[in-house]
Amino acid sequence: KRSPLPSPMPDGTLIRTPLCRTIVYSSVHCSLLGEWNKLNCIAGVCDLNYMMMPAIHKRHQEGKLIDLGNSMTPDAEKMITINPDAILLSPYKDNGGYGKFDKSGIPIIECADYMETSPLGRAEWMKFYGMLYGCESQASSMFNKIEKEYLTYKSLALKSKSEKRPTVFADLK
């Protein structure tokens, strides 16, 4: 995190890793950080009332984590007060940019994992998050386990001769 920067620096957003103080919009990403014992790196969340993670609520009650309100209109002053290393959020189509946050100097990391069309593509994003938080080996190990299980079940399903296969629903709304 403190290593010297190359010169000249290319255009783009500089993110120094590992991230130690972040704002996280999604309970999916909070859960992943929980798996790696990195909940202490979450300084703020949006939509706390929708997060079904007792550990996140406990950290909020202890004053270790700030509720920033609705993810579509988060409390900008609280976000800036947190002084995060980065904001992890899900990009929305036609959102018109990030307003005040674009000018705040806080790096914005668009977590587009939910846009992946394959389960393994979506799962592989954990390697990216692992790099951000210094959990590369944990992320790689977790992904390898998921990949192995997925391929096993996929192979099993392809071998099924039954015309009456069960229907699977995901992403309940």
For each of these PLM feature ranges, what is it?
Residues R21, K64, E77, T81-K173:
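Extracytoplasmic substrate-binding proteins
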Residues R2-I80, A86-K93:
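A short, structured surface patch at a secondary-structure boundary
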